[in-house]
């Protein structure tokens, strides 16, 4: 959402994004649940999103598993109709990503790069969002690999059970 909002609304959008991100992490307005995905809706401005947490997480440093502190790890698809945001994909790894190091998203045999900013990462364009959503609808799981600013390699696996139904519900609620 940051990418789309920043392009359409400048600085005001950055504030709006921060607010939407905060709502995405703290909202209790769950309107539906589709297996491993939850659907949220907020008003003023109207925004809808689906979110899932990982089913498996692996943290490695120096080739060895390590225990690390991470905040919420979530995969999102967001709709913000007032800003023209229609199905923007994003990921938060629960830590600051290593700057200028792409985050990889693999669904089946398809891999996409996502670009980090702080604790969040997004695809490079709305066209890539569309490709990713299409892959997510066909897939069984999504694997996100990233590197923290401290050098920890993380691998987070998300189930895609319920993704298509949750996405359809969010689209319907945020036309």
Q: Which residue ranges define each predicted feature?
A:
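Bacterial N-terminal signal peptides
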Residues: 8-19
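Positively charged n-region of N-terminal signal peptides that target proteins for export
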Residues: 1-4
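A generic "folded-domain core" signal
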Residues: 23-175
